[in-house]
């Protein structure tokens, strides 16, 4: 990921972001930091970039010309399609979800104001996002830019090294982080809680959750209220049909899903990153009312829907133009114990990088979206099985969290490589505290057989993966009645 910072004080940015974890990430090529001095683009021979504001007032204002020319220089490096973030107290409050959204961009341009601000005309011309880090005034935008870059960069694959840690920290899933302790076991009469010394990971997990809940209830009741609503929805779906609703349960548990609707009649969850809506109507009579809660699809864009009941389809078709509908079953690994590992010592499973894009696209035909597959590779979510150093197959994790993309090359089949790949992904998700699940296209007996072998349970009910766009298909009239 590439960060471009337009500033009058480049040394402040460079010094602040070249140490510790971010400094290492820059050196290892996980992120790049391009700091551009606005003063270098002024047409004033004295390098002046500010002037008095029209209408009077205290202080000086940064002029439009040097900012615009500086922006154009940065935009040329990005292809001119990057989001431009202006740091201002007037902007939207920065939060973790916003950091996650920005982390999916390839390039970000930060514009740092100073003095009394920047000429409004250039802001209207180039800025896409106005962001604030709090209701207070600073001397410039450099510190807010560094705060945002730190929060965003740590979500980029490879930056933290331990990828799991980004998922289990303060603000994850509407909970504050649990208390943590290090050596010695006793300090100034204060002892480490006994449960943390027990080695019982189940007890430790339960204790940490209880501590997170207690802290959130005490310090952030606003967050805890949202957490309780999510937990109520999760418990409702568990009781009704755990296998059928595991994708929705996990979306909420992992902090991905946003509740659009939650009632006794049904639930809608939106995964903004995946541009996906998961829908469950507990009674057929609620399908129309539930579908009406869906927001409109923007023109020329596509949205995906997972329908957990077939009777939702007719109401979805009344609102949107259905492009495709695929029936499938959900396979869920309900155990907490790891699956046995590789069948052969000469088999190595590791993440694939972008260099394997063409090969993956050539062998995997279910998804032919090159941009999607590139994003999955860049984020480290496709794993390859190498037999004696040669790629023999691969599997991956889809954006919304399901396991899939399993493909073993024909010459390597019937050697247990597919099972080894799936076992590796299952164990990875178990280590994150997730419940592994995947989607099996209806009547795919070969895949169903593998899931049974791996110990996964299949939902009896059929789900439907639907692609849709704005508008509805025009009604095709039947034959004219005979006269």
Language-model region placement:
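Structured adenosyl-cofactor binding patch, chiefly the S-adenosyl-L-methionine
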Residues: 122-164
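A conserved beta-strand-loop-helix scaffold within acyl/acetyltransferase catalytic domains
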Residues: 371-410
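Short amphipathic alpha-helix that is part of the acyltransferase structural core
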Residues: 229-246, 328, 335-370, 482-483
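Conserved catalytic-core motifs of GNAT/GCN5-like acyltransferases
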Residues: 321-334, 455-474
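Conserved acetyl-CoA-binding loop-helix of GNAT-fold acetyltransferases
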Residues: 285-294, 414-427, 448-449, 453
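N-terminal charged segments
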Residues: 228-315, 361-366, 370, 374-375
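S-adenosyl-L-methionine/SAH cofactor-binding core of RNA-modifying enzymes
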Residues: 63-114
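Conserved active-site alpha-helix within GNAT-family acetyltransferase domains
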Residues: 310-322, 442-460
């Amino acid at each position: 990921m590439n960060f471009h910072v337009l500033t009058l004080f480049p040394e402040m940015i460079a010094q602040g972001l070249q140490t510790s974890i971010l400094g290492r990430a820059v050196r290892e090529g996980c992120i790049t930091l391009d700091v551009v001095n606005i003063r270098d683009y002024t047409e004033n021979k004295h390098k002046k970039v500010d002037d008095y504001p029209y209408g009077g007032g205290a202080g000086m204002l940064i002029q439009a010309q040097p900012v615009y020319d500086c922006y154009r220089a940065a935009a040329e490096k990005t292809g001119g399609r990057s989001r431009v973030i202006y740091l201002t107290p007037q902007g939207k409050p920065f939060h973790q979800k916003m950091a996650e959204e920005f982390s999916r961009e390839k390039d970000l341009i930060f514009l740092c104001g100073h003095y009394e601000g920047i000429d409004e005309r250039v802001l209207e011309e180039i800025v896409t996002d106005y962001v604030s880090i709090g209701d207070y005034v600073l001397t410039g935008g450099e510190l807010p830019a560094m705060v945002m870059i730190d929060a965003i960069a740590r979500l980029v694959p490879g930056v933290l090294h331990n990828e799991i840690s980004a998922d289990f920290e303060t603000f994850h899933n509407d909970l504050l982080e649990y208390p943590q302790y290090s050596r010695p076991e006793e300090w100034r009469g204060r002892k480490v809680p006994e449960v943390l010394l027990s080695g019982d990971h189940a007890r430790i997990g339960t204790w940490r959750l209880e501590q997170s809940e207690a802290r959130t209830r005490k310090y952030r009741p606003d967050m805890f209220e949202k957490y309780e609503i999510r937990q109520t929805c999760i418990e409702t779906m568990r009781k009704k049909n755990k296998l059928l609703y595991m994708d929705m349960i996990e979306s909420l548990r992992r902090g991905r899903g946003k509740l659009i609707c939650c009632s006794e009649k049904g639930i809608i969850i939106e995964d903004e990153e995946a541009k996906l809506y998961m829908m469950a109507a507990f009674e057929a009579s609620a399908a129309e009312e539930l579908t009406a809660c869906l927001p409109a699809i923007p023109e020329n864009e596509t949205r995906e829907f997972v329908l957990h009941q077939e009777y939702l389809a007719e109401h979805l078709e009344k609102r949107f133009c259905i492009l495709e509908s695929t029936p499938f079953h959900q396979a869920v690994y309900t155990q907490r114990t790891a699956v046995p590992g590789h069948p052969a010592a000469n088999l190595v499973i590791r993440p694939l990088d972008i260099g394997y894009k063409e090969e993956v696209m050539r062998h995997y035909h279910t998804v032919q979206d090159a941009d999607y597959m590139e994003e999955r590779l860049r984020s480290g979510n496709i794993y390859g099985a190498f037999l004696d150093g040669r790629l023999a197959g691969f599997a991956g994790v889809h954006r919304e969290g399901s396991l899939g993309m399993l493909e073993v090359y024909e010459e390597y089949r019937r050697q247990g490589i597919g099972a080894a790949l799936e076992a590796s992904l299952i164990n990875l998700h178990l280590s994150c505290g997730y419940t592994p699940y995947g989607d099996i296209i209806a009547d795919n007996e070969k895949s169903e057989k593998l899931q049974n072998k791996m110990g996964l349970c299949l939902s009896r009910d059929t789900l439907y993966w639907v692609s849709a766009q704005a508008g509805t298909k025009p009604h095709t009239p039947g034959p004219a009645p005979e006269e």
